[in-house]
Each structure stands twice: as structure tokens, then as C-alpha cells.
């Protein structure tokens, strides 16, 4: 993420009072973490190609509660926070598009399952990001409302 874009994101996080921000399609070629003023960024991209990539960006207040971060791969990253009465795990994902090979879809969900198995059972869990899925406007009680977009796709059905 270039410095100009980073400054805009930090300003918007402050303006709308967002403490934790998930980013998809970062398109970086490395993994790691860095701080910029009062924000911390944990990111993971592909080693050679500038595609995919995920990041989690937090403000200083949230950073003080960080217990750890798992830079899994260019499609998912997890973040563990100390909370009360329960700790919190946030997983940021960037799912394959509908035209991806079946093997890539399978790999994505296997990797996600691995992250879920590493999540302590008592944690509050948030999975955020771009699922590249349409769930349609058909209501699924307890899962989706009736205000979805378009017709559901196979990726949407798998997500539900």
C-alpha cells in the first residue's frame, strides 16, 4: 500500500470511528507488519505475483490488546485480541472468484478450516472480507436477510 493510500485509509478509519479494518486485494508481494503513526498493519501477499493479498489494520488502542497474528497466506490472515469477558479472533479473507479452478476453491476452504481449528473455542469469532459470493435476495432465517443482491451463485451457496 503506497503512502498516499495509507494516509487516506487512516483518515477514513478515524472519521467513521473504525478500530479494526480488513483489507482485500492488497496486491503486495510480501508478508509482515509495520506501524504508521498510531496505526498498525499486518499484511500477507503472494511471494512473486502482485495479486490477491490481505491485511488487517488497527488503531493504537486495539494494538495494545493484540495477543498474536497468523500471516497464513495471500488469501487469509487471523488476528487474536485480548477481550473481556472473552478473547476475540478476527479472520480476514479474500475468497477465489467464481471462475477459479475447483482446486483453488478447495484449497481456500481447507486453509480456512485450519485457521478455525486453531481458534480457541471460547473466543468470539469474526470472519470478515471479500467472499466473492452472491447469496441472492432469498431469505435464509438466521443467516441472510431478504435484501441480498441478484441471484445466488454456487460460491454463495457454499458460504451459507
Question: Locations of the language-model features?
Answer:
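A shared catalytic/ligand-binding motif for oxyanion handling
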Residues: 1-160
Amino acid at each position: 500500500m503506497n503512502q498516499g493510500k495509507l494516509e487516506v485509509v487512516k483518515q477514513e478509519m478515524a472519521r467513521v470511528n473504525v478500530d479494526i479494518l480488513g483489507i482485500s486485494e492488497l496486491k503486495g508481494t510480501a508478508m509482515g507488519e509495520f506501524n504508521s503513526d498510531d496505526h498498525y498493519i499486518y499484511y500477507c501477499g503472494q511471494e512473486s505475483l502482485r495479486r490477491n493479498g490481505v491485511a488487517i489494520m488497527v488503531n493504537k488502542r486495539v494494538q495494545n490488546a493484540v495477543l498474536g497474528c497468523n500471516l497464513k497466506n495471500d488469501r487469509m490472515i487471523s488476528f487474536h485480541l485480548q477481550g473481556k469477558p472473552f478473547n476475540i479472533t478476527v479472520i480476514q479473507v479474500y475468497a477465489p472468484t467464481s471462475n477459479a479452478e475447483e482446486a483453488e476453491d478447495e484449497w481456500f476452504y481447507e486453509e480456512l478450516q485450519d485457521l478455525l481449528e486453531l481458534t480457541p473455542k471460547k473466543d468470539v469469532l469474526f470472519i470478515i472480507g471479500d467472499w466473492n459470493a452472491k447469496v441472492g435476495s432469498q431469505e435464509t432465517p438466521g443467516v441472510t436477510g431478504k435484501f441480498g443482491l441478484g441471484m445466488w451463485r454456487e460460491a454463495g451457496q457454499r458460504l451459507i
